[in-house]
Amino acid sequence: MTATSGALHTVLGAGPAGTSVALELARRGHAVRLIDRAGSGEALDGVERLAGDVGTVDGALAAIEGADVVYHCVNVAYHLQIDVMPGIQEAVLGAVARTGARLVVLDTLYPYGETRGEVMTEDTPWRAATAKGKMRAALDENYLAAHKEDRAQVALGRSADFVGPRVLNSTLGAAVFPAALTGGEVPALGDIDLEHSYSSILDVARGLAVLGENPSGDGRVWHLPTAPARTTREIFTALGDLVGHPLRTVMVDEPRPFGPFDETFMNSYAELFYQHTEPQIMNSSAFQRKFGLAPTPIETTLSQTLEWYRGFLSARAKD
């Protein structure tokens, strides 16, 4: 798709999602700014990196100056989310309400809460009972209300657990791929024989870019393209085939520190551990039908992720 003449796309948050979105938008020919508090990091072709703080309306206004479309990919550590994320929403919503920029929000599955294995679609009721799930549901209600009341133009894209290049803090991230490559121990969270959806971070980026290019998607929640759910054991087996040896899994059947998942993280994540004790199956067919964007096969995503981690570990070894 060709870029809209003169349109500026501004991405808030330079984690794996924000960085991937910025790169995807640049690949599509858009003018792109990537904003985080530091304004530094790896050089990205076609992306202008700037420092900004979206914790206040004034800060958010400065960050999105001149933007036609804003992508909210900001996240914070689990133990800070309940205190910090509502304020960021207030600031970002307030800023786009003043400027008229469209807002595309990266969202989670937390509002659904425990599903007892029910396939999650955009029509699944929001039954969150955890503090973080209720917080995310309240944020989403605010976004949709702002759109309905014509205070802002908003689209929400929900993702399952991330996997892919640059993804570290995920259950299929830095706890798994380095150990797979080196023969170390891989945590097997909960019941790995349950089906579990994982979203390629590159598909997340493509999906959010499509929402940014298509106002017809505004005013609702979408499930971003996600490959059919597989059991985590099947994914570990496929990963073992790619690295040439079976993974050395260690069962973690309750939330406790393991590897990169320290005590602070696990204590905060404990209320969401149900995601590993019941099937987590996300269906993205509505998005696929509407926008014609299919998810990447999980085997391809695993190969892409391994390639990135090989480079990541090699670069770290030289430091």
Question: What are the language-model segments listed below?
Answer:
Residues 195-202, 222-242, 296:
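Substrate-binding strand-loop-helix patch
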Residues 40-41, 47-99:
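NAD(P)H-binding glycine-rich loop region in Rossmannoid oxidoreductase-like domains
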Residues 234-281, 314-319:
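Terminal hydrophobic/aromatic helix or amphipathic segment near a protein terminus
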Residues 149, 160-195, 239:
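NAD(P)-dependent short-chain dehydrogenase/reductase
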Residues 108, 141-166:
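Conserved beta-loop-beta element that borders a ligand/cofactor-binding pocket
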Residues 164-175, 211-222, 245:
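Glycine/proline-rich active-site loop of Rossmann-fold NAD(P)-dependent oxidoreductases
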Residues 90-138:
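Conserved Rossmann-fold NAD(P)-dependent oxidoreductase catalytic core, especially the SDR/UDP-sugar
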Residues 288, 297-319:
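Amphipathic terminal alpha-helices
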